[in-house]
């Protein structure tokens, strides 16, 4: 009956809310949305072109396929001293062209000086091999937090772009 379903759904919602409140009482305090310094979140590394097994490539996402396009990744780094909740933030490539943005999952927290890696197979963000492209991260309100761009025809096999705190981008393999 419809009334029973409505009561059941309301109870489940309340239980999930209580579960979140209990979880948040652990030793690690998560910076709330209003208090976090979102400028501490940076795109620290991207891999555009994974090398195949024939060329000693790496299976970056451990899915059993070496050099597949699913091995492309974007790495986020929390350069700050407090954990930051990045739930509902948007990861994107070139906004005018390119892939649809990827909304980060609920309850996604990057620990202080911690990293998370988002692979193409889960984000559906396709970084371009031949044309210039960029990766960007925006907060839940759409404010651009950081980006990393690279030029056309510059992606080497199994070589990623790394950005340091000063914003300098270099290639590493």
State the predicted function of each range:
Residues 1-35:
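Secretory targeting signatures
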Residues 22-171:
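Activation on beta-sandwich/Ig-like modules and their edge loops
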